[in-house]
UniProtKB/Swiss-Prot annotation:
The keyword Ribosomal protein does not apply. It comes from Saccharomyces cerevisiae (strain ATCC 204508 / S288c). The gene is EAR1. It comes from the Eukaryota. Belongs to the SSH4 family. Residues 172-375 form the B30.2/SPRY domain. This is Protein EAR1. Keywords: Endosome, Glycoprotein, Membrane, Phosphoprotein, Protein transport, Signal-anchor, Transmembrane, Transmembrane helix, Transport, Vacuole. It is found in: Endosome membrane; Vacuole membrane. Glycans are attached at N110, N203, N210, N256, N295. GO terms for biological process: protein transport to vacuole involved in ubiquitin-dependent protein catabolic process via the multivesicular body sorting pathway. InterPro entries: B30.2/SPRY (IPR001870), B30.2/SPRY_sf (IPR043136), ConA-like_dom_sf (IPR013320), SPRY_dom (IPR003877), SPRY_Ssh4-like (IPR035780), Ubq-SigPath_Reg (IPR050618).
Length: 550
C-alpha cells in the first residue's frame, strides 16, 4: 500500500509542478483531492505517456528486426551458395568422421552446383547420350558410376577457413598435404611428383620410367594416369609441360583423326582410369585433336572442337593453374593459347586438390616436366612457376664425369698412368733382351724420387766392427762327392762333414785357410793314432761291433 501511495505522490507532484529546484514535495495522502476533474486529467497524462513509450519501443524493435533480417539473409544466402540448399545450418561443426563418405558426396554435389555443366542436366544428358554408340554409352555410365562410388576428396572451405582462424593446436591436419608430404617435397623438389598407375588397370597398359616418362601400350581403348601428389596451391601460379616424345604413327591423319586421341589435363581424384580426362566431373583437358573438354563426354560444338591447334609427335603442351582465381590456361610449344572465342579461360575452378593427368587410347610415350629442368614457355622460367625447386634440399649424387677433380680418384689416376707409362716404356727394352735394375731411381710425374724397394740387406742390421765380405752362394760351393758311410772311412766322413759345414756360407779365402789348417790337424791326429795303445783300438772295435749288432 505504501508503494502505491509513493507512486501516486510522484505522479501528482510531477504533473502539478510541485517538484521545484531539484527537490520533490511529497503531498500527504490525506491532502490529495480525488475530484472528478483531477482524476480525468491524471488518466489522460498517463495514457499519453504510455502511448509514447509504446511508440518508442516499437520503433526500436523494428530497427533491430530490420538489421537482423538483413544480416541473416546475407549469411543464409552465402551459405547456400557455398554448400547448397540441401545442407543443414548449424552453429556447431557437423562434420562426422563416421559419415565421411556421405560428407564427400555432398561436397561433390555442391561443387557441381557451383560449376554447372552438361552432365548435370538429366534431360540434356538423355538426348546427347542417345547420339553415342552403345560402347560409348556403356563406358560413360561406368565412369559416372565410378565417380559416385568413389567421390573425390574435397575439404569444406568454410571449415578450412575456420581452422586457420582458430587455435593452431586444435586445427585439423590436412590428410593429403600434411607435414610429412611437405617435408618430402622440400627434400625432393620437383622430383617428388611421379605418375602412378591405378592398381585395377590391366597389366602392361601403362609403363612409368624415371617417375615422369609415361608409355601407353593400349590400343583402341581409353586409359589415364595421374600423379601421386596434387598441386600444392601455395604459390599463385603452377605450370607443367607434357612432351609427345613418341607416337605410333600420325595422330591426326584421315584414318586416325576421330579415334587416336591423347589428352592432357587436370582433375580431382579418384578419376576413372578407363576414361580420358575432361569427360567427367571436375576435369579439364586439351585433346591432341585440338578440342578443349571441360566436364563433357559428348559431341562438342564446332568452336570447342577446333579451339586449339592439333598436336603431333614432338609438340609440347603446357597447363597452367592460378590457385587464387581458379583459372586454367594452356600453351603449345611455348606460346600461350587464346580462348576468347569460347568466352576466355576457365575461371573460378577452385578445388583443394587438383592432379595432373594424362590419357590416351593409342600407343605413345609422354615426358612430363614439373620443374626439374627449364620450360619451353619462357614466362614460366622467369617467374619460376614450377611445382617446386628443381632439386630441393636433398644433396644430389656425385658426378663422375670430371673424376680428375676428386682427390682420391686423382691419386688413383696417377698410379694407373704411371703403370701404363712404365709398361709402354719398358716393353721395347724387355723385347730386346735388356734387364732393368730394380735399384734404379724411380721418378714420378711430379719429379719426386721414390725410395728403392726393400732388399735382404735391409732385413737385419749389418754387424758392426767386422768387414763385410760379398760372397756368392751357388752349387759350386757345395761338396762334389756324396758322403761315404763305410766303416773304414768313418773318420774321413766326420772330417769332410765338418769341412763341408765350414764351407757352406763362407768365402773362398776362408775355405782355403781352413782346409790347410785341417790338413795339418789330420796329420797330427794320424801320428797320434800310431802312437796310441793297441788296447784302445780293440776297445773301440768292440764298441763298433756292438753298435752294428744293435
Amino acid at each position: 500500500m505504501s508503494f502505491k501511495f509513493l507512486i501516486e505522490s510522484l505522479l501528482l507532484g510531477s504533473i502539478s509542478g510541485q517538484i521545484r529546484c531539484g527537490r520533490s514535495s511529497v503531498i500527504p495522502r490525506g491532502d490529495v483531492s480525488y475530484g472528478g476533474d483531477d482524476t480525468d486529467e491524471l488518466n489522460m497524462d498517463i495514457m499519453l505517456f504510455a502511448f509514447g513509450t509504446l511508440i518508442v519501443v516499437y520503433i526500436v524493435i523494428c530497427i533491430v528486426y530490420f538489421f537482423t533480417k538483413q544480416i541473416a539473409t546475407r549469411l543464409i544466402t552465402a551459405y547456400y551458395n557455398e554448400h547448397g540448399p540441401g545442407q543443414r545450418i548449424s552453429l556447431f561443426s557437423d562434420y562426422d568422421e563416421n559419415n565421411a563418405h556421405v560428407h564427400s558426396r555432398r561436397l561433390m554435389e555442391n561443387m557441381s552446383l557451383r560449376w554447372p555443366n552438361n552432365l548435370d542436366d538429366a534431360d540434356e544428358v538423355r538426348d546427347k547420350l542417345a547420339q553415342l554408340s552403345p560402347e560409348e554409352q556403356f563406358y560413360y555410365k561406368q565412369g559416372e558410376e565410378y565417380i559416385k562410388q568413389n567421390p573425390p576428396f574435397l575439404l569444406n572451405q568454410g571449415l578450412l577457413q575456420q581452422s586457420e582462424d582458430s587455435n593452431p593446436d586444435t586445427t585439423r591436419e590436412d590428410p593429403i598435404m600434411n607435414e610429412q608430404t611437405r617435408q618430402y617435397i622440400q627434400e625432393e623438389g620437383a622430383y617428388a611428383w611421379e605418375f602412378s598407375p591405378n592398381p585395377d588397370m590391366p597389366n602392361h597398359t601403362v609403363i612409368v620410367e624415371n617417375k615422369t616418362e609415361v608409355s601407353f601400350l593400349n590400343y583402341n581403348y581409353d586409359a589415364s594416369i595421374s600423379t601421386n601428389l596434387p598441386i600444392p596451391c601455395i604459390n599463385k601460379v603452377y605450370y607443367c609441360e607434357f612432351k609427345i616424345f613418341e607416337t605410333d604413327g600420325p595422330l591426326n591423319s584421315d584414318e586416325n583423326v576421330s579415334k587416336g586421341v591423347i589428352s592432357f589435363g587436370l582433375s580431382t581424384q579418384p578419376y576413372p582410369y578407363f576414361r580420358l580426362p575432361g569427360r567427367h566431373h571436375h576435369s579439364i583437358a586439351y585433346d591432341s585433336n585440338g578440342a578443349r573438354r571441360f566436364n563433357d563426354s559428348f559431341k562438342l560444338n564446332e568452336q570447342l572442337r577446333t579451339l586449339f591447334p592439333q598436336c603431333e609427335k614432338g609438340d609440347i603442351v603446357g597447363i597452367g593453374y592460378r590457385s587464387r582465381s581458379g583459372t586454367v590456361f594452356f600453351t603449345r610449344n611455348g606460346k600461350k593459347l587464346n580462348e576468347k572465342s569460347v568466352g576466355g579461360h576457365i575461371r573460378g575452378w577452385k578445388f583443394q586438390y587438383l592432379y595432373p593427368i594424362i590419357g590416351s587410347n593409342v600407343p605413345c610415350q609422354i615426358h612430363v616436366n614439373f620443374g626439374t629442368y627449364g620450360f619451353v614457355y619462357i614466362e614460366a622460367n622467369v617467374k619460376k612457376w614450377g611445382y617446386a625447386k628443381s632439386n630441393g634440399i636433398k644433396l644430389p649424387p656425385p658426378s663422375y664425369e670430371d673424376y680428375g677433380k676428386d682427390t682420391l680418384l686423382e691419386s688413383g689416376g696417377e698410379d694407373n698412368d704411371f703403370d701404363e707409362d712404365f709398361s709402354d716404356g719398358d716393353s721395347d727394352n724387355i723385347a730386346a733382351g735388356s734387364t732393368t735394375n730394380l735399384n734404379d731411381d724411380i721418378i714420378i710425374r711430379n719429379g719426386e724420387i721414390l725410395p728403392p724397394p726393400p732388399g735382404f740387406e735391409f732385413t737385419m742390421s749389418p754387424p758392426t766392427g767386422k768387414k763385410i765380405i760379398n760372397e756368392e752362394i751357388n752349387l759350386d760351393s757345395l761338396p762334389m762327392l756324396p758322403p761315404s758311410y763305410s766303416d773304414d772311412e768313418h773318420h774321413s766322413k766326420n772330417d769332410k762333414s765338418a769341412i763341408s759345414g765350414r764351407i757352406i756360407g763362407t768365402s773362398r779365402n776362408l775355405i782355403t785357410d781352413e782346409a790347410s789348417f785341417d790338413s795339418v790337424d789330420n796329420d797330427n791326429e794320424d801320428e797320434n793314432d800310431h802312437e796310441r795303445d793297441p788296447e784302445q783300438f780293440s776297445e773301440f772295435d768292440d764298441y763298433e761291433s756292438r753298435m752294428h749288432g744293435i
